[in-house]
């Protein structure tokens, strides 16, 4: 049975009302639906995202985008997810395990260099120490503050699951390429960060030109195109933002969890 639209029902009601006076009184739409805010609250759809786990799911699936900060009421949830419960580690392990199984089953080309592209921040290295200082993403910081923090030589510890994948990829005969949106200005501190995490080998470490304001998704897409033109066979990509993984992305992509911030894609 087809469901009549609201407008059609109102039209029918008006017709019947005209032919039979007093039978039906049309009701104003405001009376029907009430206050929108009250409806949202009633249906648990308010922008406060009282269910932080559902908010997080929306972030990871790219249904919730363009958020400036983590909802204030989700601070404890994010801290528990990242630190206390170890769910972050479990989720990352699942992603990296699937990436390894995929890579292990590949028929690699013999006439070219097979490469796997790794994002850097919150893929191989963690920014959690920085965001922990600002309410686990609930406090808004100045643009560029993270990069200035990096410049102080601050520690960005390695993320064990992605580091394990990195080692496995090398053992499979696939060359790792690290593609970061850090400016070349931070090359020395980046090398220190990587060495401290045990990352000492790569085919290329690609950093963004100093002062570049190119959007991350555009910048990384251009780099991938350039690598393909040079003859590299990109078999896989892994990152914590969809901006790392969309637009002209050869090979399969693997998305790591990150509830701390959003990079437009």
UniProtKB/Swiss-Prot annotation:
Pfam families: Acid_phosphat_B. The keyword Flavoprotein does not apply. One of its GO terms (biological process) is response to wounding. Glycans are attached at residues 110, 188, 210. One of its GO terms (cellular component) is cytosolic ribosome. GO terms for molecular function: acid phosphatase activity; nutrient reservoir activity. Highly expressed in flowers, but also found in leaves, vegetative shoots, petioles, peduncles, and receptacles of floral organs. This is Vegetative storage protein 2. It comes from Arabidopsis thaliana.
């Amino acid at each position: 049975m087809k469901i009549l639209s609201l407008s059609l029902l109102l039209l029918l009601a008006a017709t019947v009302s005209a032919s039979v006076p007093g039978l039906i009184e049309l009701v104003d739409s405001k009376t029907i639906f009430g206050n929108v805010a009250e409806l949202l609250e009633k249906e648990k759809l308010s922008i406060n995202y009282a269910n932080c786990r559902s908010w997080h799911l929306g972030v990871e699936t790219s249904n919730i985008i363009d958020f400036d900060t983590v909802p204030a009421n989700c601070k404890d949830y994010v801290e528990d997810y990242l630190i206390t419960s170890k769910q972050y580690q479990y989720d990352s392990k699942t992603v990296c395990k699937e990436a390894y199984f995929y890579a292990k089953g590949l028929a690699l080309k013999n006439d070219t260099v097979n490469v796997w592209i790794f994002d850097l921040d919150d893929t191989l290295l963690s920014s959690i120490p920085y965001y922990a200082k600002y309410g686990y993403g609930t406090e808004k910081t100045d643009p560029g503050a993270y990069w200035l923090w990096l410049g102080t030589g601050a520690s960005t510890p390695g993320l064990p699951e992605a580091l394990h994948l990195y080692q496995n990829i090398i053992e499979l005969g696939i060359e790792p390429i690290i593609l970061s949106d850090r400016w070349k200005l931070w090359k020395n501190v980046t090398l220190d960060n990587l060495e401290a995490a045990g990352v000492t080998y790569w085919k290329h470490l690609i950093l963004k030109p100093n002062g570049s304001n190119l959007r991350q998704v555009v910048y990384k897409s251009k780099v991938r195109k350039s690598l393909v033109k040079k003859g590299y066979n990109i078999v896989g990509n892994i990152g914590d933002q969809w901006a790392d993984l969309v637009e002209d992305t050869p090979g399969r992509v693997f998305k790591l969890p990150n509830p701390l911030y959003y990079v437009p894609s």
